[in-house]
From Swiss-Prot:
S-S bonds: none
Mod. after translation: Methylated by PrmB.
Pfam families for this protein: Ribosomal_L3
Subunit structure: Part of the 50S ribosomal subunit. Forms a cluster with proteins L14 and L19.
Gene Ontology cellular-component annotations: cytosolic large ribosomal subunit
Protein species of origin: Francisella tularensis subsp. holarctica (strain LVS)
HAMAP family associated with the record: Ribosomal_uL3_B
Origin: domain of life: Bacteria
GO terms (BP aspect): translation
PANTHER family assigned: 50S RIBOSOMAL PROTEIN L3 (PTHR11229), LARGE RIBOSOMAL SUBUNIT PROTEIN UL3C (PTHR11229:SF16)
Record protein name field: Large ribosomal subunit protein uL3
Amino acid sequence: MSLGLVGRKCGMTRIFTEDGVSIPVTVVQVEPNKVTQVKTVEKDGYNAIQVTTGFKKRSNVNKPMAGHYAKASVEPGRGLWEFTVDAAAEYQVGSSFDATMFEAGQKVDVRGVSKGKGFQGGVKRHNFATQDATHGNSLSHRVHGSTGQNQTPGRVFKNKKMAGHLGNENVTIQSLEVVRVDAENGLLLLKGGIPGSVGGDIIVTPAVKS
Protein backbone atom coordinates (compact mmCIF):
# COMPACT_ATOMS: atom_id res chain seq x y z
CA MET A 1 0.00 0.00 0.00
CA SER A 2 1.25 3.47 -0.86
CA LEU A 3 0.73 6.61 1.18
CA GLY A 4 -2.90 7.73 1.27
CA LEU A 5 -5.32 9.86 3.24
CA VAL A 6 -7.88 9.15 5.96
CA GLY A 7 -11.15 11.01 5.55
CA ARG A 8 -14.76 10.92 6.63
CA LYS A 9 -17.74 10.18 4.39
CA CYS A 10 -20.11 13.17 4.27
CA GLY A 11 -22.73 11.84 1.86
CA MET A 12 -23.57 12.03 -1.84
CA THR A 13 -24.55 14.81 -4.20
CA ARG A 14 -24.09 15.59 -7.87
CA ILE A 15 -22.20 18.13 -9.91
CA PHE A 16 -22.63 19.22 -13.50
CA THR A 17 -20.02 19.44 -16.23
CA GLU A 18 -19.83 22.37 -18.63
CA ASP A 19 -21.88 20.27 -21.06
CA GLY A 20 -24.65 19.85 -18.50
CA VAL A 21 -23.90 16.20 -17.72
CA SER A 22 -24.84 15.19 -14.17
CA ILE A 23 -22.12 13.27 -12.29
CA PRO A 24 -22.99 11.53 -9.00
CA VAL A 25 -20.24 12.10 -6.44
CA THR A 26 -19.46 11.15 -2.86
CA VAL A 27 -18.08 13.94 -0.68
CA VAL A 28 -15.18 12.94 1.58
CA GLN A 29 -13.95 15.40 4.19
CA VAL A 30 -10.19 15.22 4.67
CA GLU A 31 -8.79 16.97 7.72
CA PRO A 32 -4.98 17.24 7.92
CA ASN A 33 -3.41 13.80 8.38
CA LYS A 34 -0.54 14.23 10.86
CA VAL A 35 2.37 11.80 11.10
CA THR A 36 2.62 10.33 14.61
CA GLN A 37 5.30 7.71 13.96
CA VAL A 38 7.78 6.72 11.26
CA LYS A 39 8.57 3.00 11.16
CA THR A 40 11.75 1.75 9.50
CA VAL A 41 13.17 -1.62 8.52
CA GLU A 42 16.04 -1.24 10.98
CA LYS A 43 13.83 -0.58 13.99
CA ASP A 44 10.45 -2.14 13.18
CA GLY A 45 11.16 -4.62 10.39
CA TYR A 46 9.26 -2.69 7.72
CA ASN A 47 8.77 0.82 6.38
CA ALA A 48 5.52 2.55 7.28
CA ILE A 49 3.97 5.87 8.22
CA GLN A 50 1.49 6.10 11.09
CA VAL A 51 -0.98 8.99 10.92
CA THR A 52 -3.87 10.42 12.88
CA THR A 53 -6.64 12.82 11.93
CA GLY A 54 -9.56 14.59 13.54
CA PHE A 55 -9.82 15.52 17.19
CA LYS A 56 -10.37 13.68 20.47
CA LYS A 57 -10.80 15.29 23.89
CA ARG A 58 -7.81 14.74 26.13
CA SER A 59 -10.11 13.35 28.83
CA ASN A 60 -10.94 10.49 26.45
CA VAL A 61 -7.29 9.60 25.74
CA ASN A 62 -5.62 7.06 28.02
CA LYS A 63 -2.11 7.66 29.36
CA PRO A 64 -0.19 5.37 26.96
CA MET A 65 -1.82 7.01 23.93
CA ALA A 66 -1.40 10.49 25.43
CA GLY A 67 2.32 9.78 25.75
CA HIS A 68 2.44 8.52 22.18
CA TYR A 69 0.88 11.72 20.85
CA ALA A 70 3.02 13.91 23.11
CA LYS A 71 6.19 12.25 21.84
CA ALA A 72 5.21 13.19 18.30
CA SER A 73 4.06 16.69 19.37
CA VAL A 74 0.70 16.01 17.73
CA GLU A 75 -2.78 16.71 19.09
CA PRO A 76 -4.77 13.50 19.84
CA GLY A 77 -6.87 12.35 16.89
CA ARG A 78 -9.84 10.03 16.59
CA GLY A 79 -7.67 7.06 15.65
CA LEU A 80 -4.40 5.77 14.22
CA TRP A 81 -3.86 4.46 10.71
CA GLU A 82 -0.79 3.08 8.98
CA PHE A 83 0.47 3.18 5.39
CA THR A 84 3.38 1.09 4.18
CA VAL A 85 5.85 3.10 2.09
CA ASP A 86 9.07 2.40 0.22
CA ALA A 87 11.24 5.01 1.92
CA ALA A 88 10.07 6.00 5.39
CA ALA A 89 13.10 8.24 5.93
CA GLU A 90 11.55 10.82 3.59
CA TYR A 91 8.84 11.62 6.15
CA GLN A 92 9.09 13.52 9.41
CA VAL A 93 7.09 13.04 12.62
CA GLY A 94 4.68 15.94 13.02
CA SER A 95 4.37 16.70 9.31
CA SER A 96 0.92 16.59 7.75
CA PHE A 97 -0.87 15.79 4.49
CA ASP A 98 -4.14 17.14 3.11
CA ALA A 99 -6.52 16.78 0.17
CA THR A 100 -4.03 18.37 -2.23
CA MET A 101 -2.22 15.02 -2.31
CA PHE A 102 -4.70 14.07 -5.05
CA GLU A 103 -5.74 15.91 -8.18
CA ALA A 104 -8.83 15.95 -10.39
CA GLY A 105 -8.92 13.08 -12.87
CA GLN A 106 -6.72 10.81 -10.77
CA LYS A 107 -7.83 7.23 -10.06
CA VAL A 108 -7.97 6.12 -6.42
CA ASP A 109 -8.90 3.07 -4.34
CA VAL A 110 -11.31 3.63 -1.46
CA ARG A 111 -11.61 1.43 1.65
CA GLY A 112 -14.34 1.56 4.25
CA VAL A 113 -16.53 -0.57 6.49
CA SER A 114 -19.82 -1.48 4.83
CA LYS A 115 -23.15 -0.82 6.52
CA GLY A 116 -24.09 -3.58 8.95
CA LYS A 117 -27.47 -5.14 8.18
CA GLY A 118 -27.66 -7.69 10.97
CA PHE A 119 -28.75 -11.32 10.56
CA GLN A 120 -30.21 -11.83 7.07
CA GLY A 121 -31.56 -14.79 5.14
CA GLY A 122 -30.10 -16.42 2.05
CA VAL A 123 -32.30 -14.49 -0.38
CA LYS A 124 -30.98 -11.10 0.72
CA ARG A 125 -27.49 -12.19 1.75
CA HIS A 126 -26.59 -14.37 -1.27
CA ASN A 127 -29.26 -13.49 -3.84
CA PHE A 128 -30.84 -16.95 -3.62
CA ALA A 129 -34.00 -17.54 -5.67
CA THR A 130 -37.19 -17.93 -3.69
CA GLN A 131 -39.20 -21.14 -3.83
CA ASP A 132 -42.73 -21.41 -5.23
CA ALA A 133 -45.24 -18.99 -3.80
CA THR A 134 -48.07 -21.55 -4.19
CA HIS A 135 -48.41 -25.09 -5.66
CA GLY A 136 -48.50 -26.67 -2.23
CA ASN A 137 -45.58 -24.75 -0.78
CA SER A 138 -46.14 -23.35 2.69
CA LEU A 139 -43.70 -21.86 5.21
CA SER A 140 -40.73 -22.46 2.86
CA HIS A 141 -40.98 -19.56 0.43
CA ARG A 142 -37.64 -18.02 1.43
CA VAL A 143 -35.93 -21.08 2.92
CA HIS A 144 -32.54 -21.83 1.33
CA GLY A 145 -33.22 -25.58 1.03
CA SER A 146 -30.76 -28.45 1.34
CA THR A 147 -27.42 -27.74 2.99
CA GLY A 148 -25.65 -31.05 2.32
CA GLN A 149 -25.87 -34.70 1.26
CA ASN A 150 -26.37 -37.87 3.32
CA GLN A 151 -24.32 -40.07 5.64
CA THR A 152 -21.39 -39.29 3.38
CA PRO A 153 -19.95 -36.75 4.04
CA GLY A 154 -22.31 -36.43 6.99
CA ARG A 155 -21.55 -32.77 7.58
CA VAL A 156 -22.07 -29.32 6.13
CA PHE A 157 -19.04 -28.06 4.23
CA LYS A 158 -17.28 -24.92 5.41
CA ASN A 159 -18.26 -21.66 3.70
CA LYS A 160 -21.64 -23.08 2.68
CA LYS A 161 -23.83 -20.13 1.73
CA MET A 162 -26.49 -19.84 4.40
CA ALA A 163 -28.27 -17.20 6.44
CA GLY A 164 -26.02 -15.12 8.66
CA HIS A 165 -24.58 -11.71 9.44
CA LEU A 166 -24.55 -9.31 6.50
CA GLY A 167 -22.35 -6.23 6.15
CA ASN A 168 -20.04 -4.53 8.66
CA GLU A 169 -16.91 -5.74 6.88
CA ASN A 170 -13.97 -4.09 5.14
CA VAL A 171 -14.77 -3.29 1.51
CA THR A 172 -12.48 -1.81 -1.16
CA ILE A 173 -13.75 -0.04 -4.28
CA GLN A 174 -11.04 0.24 -6.93
CA SER A 175 -10.27 2.86 -9.56
CA LEU A 176 -12.72 5.60 -8.62
CA GLU A 177 -12.14 8.94 -10.30
CA VAL A 178 -11.40 12.09 -8.34
CA VAL A 179 -13.84 14.56 -9.88
CA ARG A 180 -12.82 17.61 -7.87
CA VAL A 181 -10.46 18.64 -5.06
CA ASP A 182 -11.62 21.46 -2.78
CA ALA A 183 -8.39 22.34 -0.98
CA GLU A 184 -9.91 25.31 0.85
CA ASN A 185 -12.59 23.21 2.56
CA GLY A 186 -10.59 19.96 2.64
CA LEU A 187 -13.00 18.00 0.44
CA LEU A 188 -12.54 15.24 -2.11
CA LEU A 189 -15.35 14.58 -4.59
CA LEU A 190 -15.20 10.98 -5.81
CA LYS A 191 -17.27 9.68 -8.72
CA GLY A 192 -19.91 7.16 -7.63
CA GLY A 193 -20.66 5.56 -4.30
CA ILE A 194 -18.26 4.31 -1.65
CA PRO A 195 -18.75 1.79 1.19
CA GLY A 196 -19.89 2.77 4.66
CA SER A 197 -22.40 5.02 6.32
CA VAL A 198 -22.28 8.80 6.59
CA GLY A 199 -19.66 9.78 9.15
CA GLY A 200 -17.63 6.60 8.66
CA ASP A 201 -13.85 6.66 8.25
CA ILE A 202 -12.61 6.23 4.69
CA ILE A 203 -9.09 5.45 3.45
CA VAL A 204 -8.18 6.85 0.03
CA THR A 205 -5.03 5.62 -1.73
CA PRO A 206 -3.69 5.91 -5.29
CA ALA A 207 -5.21 3.22 -7.50
CA VAL A 208 -3.29 -0.05 -7.73
CA LYS A 209 -4.67 -0.77 -11.20
CA SER A 210 -4.26 1.74 -13.99
